Design a protein with these regions (language model features):
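Extracytoplasmic gate region of multi-pass secondary transporters
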Residues: 21-84, 168
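A membrane-interface helix-boundary motif in multi-pass transporters
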Residues: 174-192
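Juxtamembrane intracellular "pre-TM" segments in multi-pass secondary transporters
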Residues: 2-31
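Paired intracellular helix-loop junctions of major facilitator superfamily
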Residues: 141-150, 180
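Interfacial helix-cap and linker-helix signal at transmembrane-aqueous boundaries
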Residues: 54-55, 85-86, 171-180
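C-terminal transmembrane helical hairpin of 12-TM major facilitator-type secondary transporters
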Residues: 69-75, 79-81, 88-140
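Multi-pass alpha-helical transporter architecture, strongest
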Residues: 190-214
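Loop-to-transmembrane helix entry/capping segments in MFS-fold secondary transporters
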Residues: 61-62, 147-156
Length: 214
């Protein structure tokens, strides 16, 4: 259960409505939900608008496609690695660092001169951080509230992710239509990553229980 929360009494089956009230009154669950909004914002902005950004920067469409492909390829490794790390070190710190690294990689990407090599390196680096947020986020929910209502509680957090996804795709398109570039949107995504780092670092993750003596 979250630090400072009451949690269900041991041996008592918690109702869905009770679990929902507990979660929505939990500071840490709310922070986790806010952070996951940023995840959706970044991921869908990149998948929707990266190809156009690269082509506008003089990079070929083939290279733009390979950059997206590398995101998918390296995501396989990154998601596994983040899930593994979440099992041996602090989940909230690992999650916060994922968001921090995303922000820093975006800063480096838009600060360096565009080139095919930079585009491919960006795809690989972002892929390592792409969906690693999912096992860490769901793991924190289980840590806070147990597994019984995970599908509902994770579903609500994922709704925030999807709202962020909408904002990332829509706002990127609106900005491009108005100004003909993505510069401010990249910096918005970088700043959002730093914001999500702070939000997730502020989560109070319970210490793991020591094993009972034999």
């Amino acid at each position: 259960m979250p630090a400072g929360g009451e949690g269900p009494l041991e041996g008592v089956v918690q109702t869905t409505s009770s679990a929902l009230r507990e979660a929505t009154s939990s500071r840490d669950y709310i922070l986790l939900t806010i952070g996951f909004f940023v995840c959706g914002l970044q991921l869908v902005f990149i998948t929707t608008h990266l190809p156009t950004y690269l082509v506008d920067s003089g990079i070929s469409g083939d290279t733009a496609s390979w950059s997206l492909a590398l995101i998918g390829l390296f995501n396989i490794v990154g998601a596994f690695l983040c899930g593994w790390l979440g099992g041996i070190v602090s989940k909230k710190k690992t999650l916060a660092i994922v968001y921090l690294l995303r922000g820093l990689i975006i800063v480096a990407f838009v600060s360096l001169p565009p080139s095919p090599v930079i585009a491919l390196l960006f795809g690989a680096a972002m892929g390592l951080l792409w969906l690693g947020t999912i096992p860490l986020t769901s793991g924190l929910i289980v840590t806070f509230f147990g597994p019984r209502h995970l599908s509902m509680l994770y579903g609500l957090v994922f709704l925030s992710h999807q709202l962020g996804s909408f904002v990332g795709a829509w706002l990127g398109g609106i900005w491009y239509d108005w100004y003909g570039n993505y510069e401010a949107m990249w910096w918005l995504n970088a700043g959002a990553g730093l914001f999500a780092f702070g939000v997730n670092w502020a989560i109070r993750e319970p210490e793991p229980l020591a094993p009972a003596p034999a």
